[in-house]
């Protein structure tokens, strides 16, 4: 995954301002060990650190205008980095950018994004960064959390909202959308791969008709590489 040395050493709590203004910051680490922070609501920008976050380079504009769609996705097979950018607060047209030089420069690229099993196109907004699967028959797959907005982020529409994921088996050219997360009213999610290849999915839920605390989150898992989700659980600790 890249050199560990920049990230080793004595643990310390350090507060460092990487960017000013706007929202939706996110951080990934590239295959070369570079830390890349992204953010933005008027245009999407990035800053790079090659020393584990001690110092940061100048701002790099990924898209202007642009609205940050969660974090980046690092392809651990090729080293390419993918950025999903919407034109404004979603639902909004989606643009995709790719970096082939460790986040130093970005180019807009065309992709094919397929709808989910309900025929709905996903939004990427307010979800965490994507990952590359490392285990099992789907090793090398790119996957990142996504969501369906049902028209807009309106409280009356929350019962129709749901999270899901998008994934690619051809290095980011074509993306399929997973089946919905098994609970409506969800959004703002993250996922991680476990050592046995199971994908753990954790999502906020704005709408909780059964009376559960809407401030807590819900979890599910996938054993088919992120195509379907099962074992829905109300999280008691997050």
Would you name each region that the model predicts?
Residues 1-238:
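Asp-box/BNR beta-propeller blade signature and adjacent active/binding-site loops
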